[in-house]
């Protein structure tokens, strides 16, 4: 499975979960975070004496970690705290904007999934009509930025936000797809 190298802190509970069934972690500091590569929701245990701030980006890879003692594992959307849910959209937007090249590349290279469905159509707001506009425009010249996409396809006025909405949709297991 793909692993995250960095994560953005969504919530930091210095006293742990108040009404936790996980007695092992009751009263122990814990953080909820989102990975910056694959948008994985994670539970992290900070190192002793480390105070984390919401929106901090922390290293959680295989090497030496300065702030994080342990990655407890994946977190389900329904177990996010109220604070994490509020921070989530902002964090996703930041990650998308900080990785513009990667997401613009998706618009340039996404192909068909089947004869009836194209990867671009998985993004909310993109149907057959816009999908073909994107495919035709990228044939002429690959897109260089979100702004370039908007300039060449005015009907897609905010491609970054469309990706943010898709990621939110993917993560929110509480609503029907």
Where are these regions (language model features)?
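Structure-specific DNA junction-binding interface
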Residues: 1-97
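Small-residue hinge/turn detector
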Residues: 127-128
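Compact, charge-rich alpha-helical regulatory domains located at protein termini
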Residues: 118, 140, 144-162
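Intrinsically disordered, low-complexity regions
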Residues: 5-10, 123, 132, 153, ...
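Short alpha-helical segments in extracytoplasmic peptidoglycan/chitin-binding modules
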Residues: 133-135, 149
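Exposed beta-sheet edge/beta-hairpin loop segments within beta-rich domains
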Residues: 123-124, 140
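Long, highly charged, low-complexity intrinsically disordered interaction regions
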Residues: 56-122, 155, 162-177
């Amino acid at each position: 499975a793909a692993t995250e190298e960095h994560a953005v802190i969504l919530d930091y509970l210095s006293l742990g979960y108040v009404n936790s069934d996980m007695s092992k972690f009751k009263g122990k500091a814990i953080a909820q975070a989102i990975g910056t590569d694959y948008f994985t929701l994670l539970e992290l245990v900070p190192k002793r004496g480390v105070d984390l701030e919401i929106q901090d980006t922390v290293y959680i890879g295989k090497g030496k970690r300065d702030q994080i003692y342990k990655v407890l594992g994946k977190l389900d959307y329904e177990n996010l705290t109220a604070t994490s849910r509020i921070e989530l959209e902002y964090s996703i937007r930041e990650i998308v904007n900080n990785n513009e090249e990667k997401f613009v590349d998706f618009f340039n290279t996404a192909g068909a999934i089947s004869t009836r469905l194209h990867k671009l159509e998985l993004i909310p707001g993109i149907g057959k009509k816009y999908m073909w506009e994107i495919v035709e425009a990228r044939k002429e010249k690959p897109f260089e930025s979100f702004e370039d996409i908007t300039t060449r396809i005015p009907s897609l006025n905010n491609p970054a936000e469309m990706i943010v909405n898709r990621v939110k949709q993917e993560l929110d297991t509480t609503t029907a797809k």
